Amino acid sequence: MPAEALLLANLFQPLINVANAVLLFFHDTIGLSWGLSIIGLTFLTRALILPLSIKQIRSMRALSALQPQIKEIQEKYKDDRERQQREMMQIYQDNNVNPFASCLPLLFQMPVFLSLLYLLRSDTFQQELHSGGDPGFLFIPDLAEKVTGWVLIVMLVLYAGTSVIAGLIMTGASASKQQRMIQLGLPLLFTPFIISFPSGVLVYWITTNVWTMGQQAVIKVFFPPDPPPTPEEIKATKPPPPPPKKKNRNR
């Protein structure tokens, strides 16, 4: 293992130990297969960060409601990017919106993702995985190894499809063309890295995408978003223009 990778593995060792303990609990205590144990780890992770996911959804809804004002500022100050950014940040501040809150669930999942990656590549866990005689899951022959051939194609289709659908559901119908292009392009961007990962990591990521899709469906039914503001409501939220300066007349 390269020195940089070894340093990162040592940094995440406490989380790797936790992930290992969770997988062993699901497999040895409950009696699930290793594939279902990884799915259980995914569900547990997503349940723990559910408050962050709710905050993410609220932030994205608030950003969506502010889009008319944002577009107006972008058009008004299209030749002055510094003023444009300043005015946009002022709108976020006035409405208590953090434009970066939508990234929190992904940021908190990355340590778990990396911990699972290092765990599946470790010799100790691979011995544990193969000792029970069930290293595979469904059509996947070995969760600790990267897949090839038609299995790889199926996994990539599942990964890309669930990533795109989950991303588009998260951004909603009000997403800009640029946001939609990003959601479509991200799976392609990560594909060269994904194909070299153990297949268990792909199981984790596909499962978290499915969780996102289900989570959004539940929230949409039980907590529907507020209707978009009318032009009159948008106009009412804008501060009144400053009064014109009185001209000094020389008597």
Residue ranges and their predicted role:
Residues M1-R251:
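Helix-loop-helix
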